[in-house]
Amino acid sequence: MSRVLVIGCGGVASVAIQKCCQVDEVFTEMCIASRTKEKCDALVEKLEGKTKTVLTTAKVDADDVDQLIELINSYKPDLVMNIALPYQDLTIMDACLACGVNYMDTANYEPEDTDDPEWRAIYEKRCKEEGFSAYFDYSWQWAYRKKFEDAGLTALLGCGFDPGVTQAYCAYALKHEFDQIDTIDILDCNGGDHGYAFATNFNPEINLREVSAPGSYWENGHWVEIPPMDIKREYNFDQVGDKDMYLLHHEEIESLAKTIPGVKRIRFFMTFGQSYLDHMRCLEDVGMLSTTPIQYNGQEIVPIQFLKALLPDPASLGPRTKGKTNIGCIFTGVKDGKEKTYYIYNVCDHQECYHEVGSQAISYTTGVPAMCGALMMLTGKWVKPGVYTVEEFDPDPFLDALDRYGLPRSESHNPKLVD
């Protein structure tokens, strides 16, 4: 029996909550909290009669630590699942520390205001020291490690698919397939078609900031940074086919470089269609991806937030998105003195996700791992004081849970490698 507070009620949170309610013997009570309480109430109404989980809702501004503390102290959860925006990771972690509650999220911290002078000074120092310039990184949350250790609390970072499952795949490969992993290529393919000329499959603001940033990868002990979309490869994905993919910076590279001993290279690739790239470059050229506020008709607006309001809500894409995703990791390395390769991945069908939980596969592949990570914490399988990423825990029960609850793994011991 457990009591869980979920902060957020967007597309990913909706999936995670519905999947939690399928495991009502563990998730016995749940409070869904968001700035827009009406969305929480609508989801509870949808789930009425379909679960034994006792559901309540609350209104909260996740940017306000005092509001969060009041809510957490009032509800007294065993775990806070942060499925809001990565901008709010630190305020929610602060509130969990103040209230003595375990924490988890699906994406690492990044600031909403990238022009904030205090943040900018720390960011520019990190760029020089580390060698990559993405706005998002783990350093802000890793800085909480001792606080969580001293409090006897667990914080689980980035438990979606990528990051999240991809790191569990790496831990699994190291545990069962290799004595030494030399290279890791993380491949994220979305073969879905939603019929729009341009739309994003998750939060547009986060998505567009991520893909328009310089790419980077880890090689021979240091970061190598490249211009955005500068490295392109074609790959034939199981059940999807040939797709163009581009090298991006992605957060799990940062943790895997520290947790996979002796790894020589880690890269992350994501597929994009030409229409998406053309629209994104045009929007960037005219300043619509900027996070710097501007004045318009006497009002201050942030261009990328205005753009987000114009684009289709990712949560609305479910009924019209067809096709499949394929996300996984390709490894090279050594086992018993012999070189070997290994590929572990998941294929997920957009329409099957929609029929089950009313979502497209992008939200599904993030929401299901969030539920499974919470399940690991609540059942005592993933509990140790401190701040950790997914690969720092035993991957076996987590991957078994994914197999059971909708994201089964596939494997190949003779995959085509990415050059």
Residue ranges and their predicted role:
Residues 175-419:
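C-terminal catalytic/substrate-binding lobe primarily of soluble NAD(P)-dependent oxidoreductases
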Residues 35-39:
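Helix N-cap at the beta1-alpha1 junction of Rossmann-like dinucleotide-binding domains, i.e.
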Residues 72, 78-81, 103-104:
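N-terminal Rossmann-like NAD(P) cofactor-binding module of classical short-chain dehydrogenase/reductase
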Residues 107-153:
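Rossmann-fold NAD(P)-binding glycine/threonine-rich loop
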Residues 61-77, 88:
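Conserved Rossmann-fold cofactor-binding substructure of NAD(P)-dependent oxidoreductases
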Residues 13-14:
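N-terminal Rossmann-fold NAD(P) dinucleotide-binding loop
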Residues 50-64:
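Rossmann-fold cofactor-recognition segment
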Residues 9-10:
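Glycine-rich Rossmann-fold phosphate-binding loop(s) that bind the pyrophosphate
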